Amino acid sequence: MGRDEMLRRSLVALAAAVVVTGVVTASVRKAAATYGFGILAIAGVLLPDWEFFDRDYSQWLTPMPASRRTAAEAAADREHDVWKFKPYPLRMAMLTTIYGFGLYKWWMYVSS
């Protein structure tokens, strides 16, 4: 399953979650908040350039070297290995904090 298929499935699951949230809470605002949070969550996981972030975190603010692979080679490689995500401790702490806070705020809004 490539990135496109994963994105499609994520968006369909998000649409189902938005419909369920809207029906259960009878609130268009809460359904829209669910949609917004879901889009940001999906974008945060599926869209980043993992080749850029797979470097040491101290190198994130410097440009990538010019000797990168061609776009065709990178696309072919991504099709075979969708999850190039390496669980570095700093990255995991950052993502857990951001997504945890976002999920908490979303839940407090939807459950109110």
UniProtKB/Swiss-Prot annotation:
Protein name as it appears in the record: Signal peptidase complex-like protein DTM1
InterPro entries found in the cross-reference section: DTM1, Spc1/SPCS1, TAT_signal
Major localization class: endoplasmic reticulum
Keyword Translocase in record: no
Gene this protein is translated from: DTM1
Transmembrane stretches, start-end: 33-53, 92-112
Pfam families assigned to the protein according to its UniProt record, in alphabetical order: SPC12
Top-level taxonomic group: Eukaryota
Family according to the record: Belongs to the SPCS1 family.
GO biological process: anther wall tapetum development; pollen development; signal peptide processing
Coiled-coil intervals, chain numbering: none
